C-alpha cells in the first residue's frame, strides 16, 4: 500500500456536500468511485480534512488514502484528474508517511467568504458569493473582527447540527477587505478548527455589525452568553470557500 496526500479544488454547487450520502452526488463519493475504477474494483476509502456542506466550495481541500500499488505522485495526479468531472480539479498529489491523516494531522484551516454588494443579485456570481444589499460600514467590521482573535468559546456560533461538545476554538486571523473591481467584501478566517456552520454564522453577525444593527463589540457579548439564538443568522453556503489546510 502507498499512502497519498492529495489537494483538490471543487465547485460545491452541484454536490450534496463532501461526505458520502446514499443516492446523493458528493465529493467524497466521486473521488472514491474514481480511485476504485483505477484499482479495477478494489474499494479505496478517502479521508478528508473536513466536511463541506452542500453549495460550499474548496480552493484547497486535502484528502488522504491508501492505494494498492506504488504509482508516482505525478502519475497519480494525472490519473485522478483524467477521471474527475468538470467541477473537481486535483491540484497536487504527494506520497506521505502512513501515519498522515488529512483530518487528524491538520493544525489549522483558512476559510474565505465572499459577499457581493449592491441592491440586486448578480445572476452570474450568485452561486459563488453571498449577497448583502444593505449599507455597510466596513471599518466597523474591521474593528469587530479583532475581538475574534484568540481562544474563545464559540457556542453562540455553532449550528445545532454539530456533534462536537467542546466549542472552544482559537482564531489566529480574522480579516475583511473590499474588492472594488468585483464590488465584494471578502472575509478570511484562520484558526485551529471550526464548528459546524461557524464561519457562516460569524459572517452573518459581522454584516449586522457593519449595518449598525449590532454593537461593534457584540462578538464579546455573544462569547459570554453562549446562546446560538442570540447570533441568529447564517450566511448562505454559496459564498464560503475552504481556502487552505495547514499541517
Swiss-Prot record:
InterPro entries from the UniProt entry: PsdUridine_synth_cat_dom_sf, PsdUridine_synth_TruA, PsdUridine_synth_TruA_a/b_dom, PsdUridine_synth_TruA_C, TruA/RsuA/RluB/E/F_N
Keyword annotations: Isomerase, tRNA processing
GO biological process assignments: tRNA pseudouridine synthesis
EC number in record: 5.4.99.12
Binding site for substrate: 111
Superkingdom classification of source: Bacteria
EC class of the enzyme, as a word: isomerase
Catalytic reaction list: uridine(38/39/40) in tRNA = pseudouridine(38/39/40) in tRNA
Active site positions, chain numbering: 53
GO molecular function per UniProt: RNA binding; tRNA pseudouridine(38-40) synthase activity
Cited function: Formation of pseudouridine at positions 38, 39 and 40 in the anticodon stem and loop of transfer RNAs.
Similarity comment: Belongs to the tRNA pseudouridine synthase TruA family.
Protein name: tRNA pseudouridine synthase A
UniProt organism field: Lacticaseibacillus paracasei (strain ATCC 334 / BCRC 17002 / CCUG 31169 / CIP 107868 / KCTC 3260 / NRRL B-441) (Lactobacillus paracasei)
Lineage: Bacteria, Bacillati, Bacillota, Bacilli, Lactobacillales
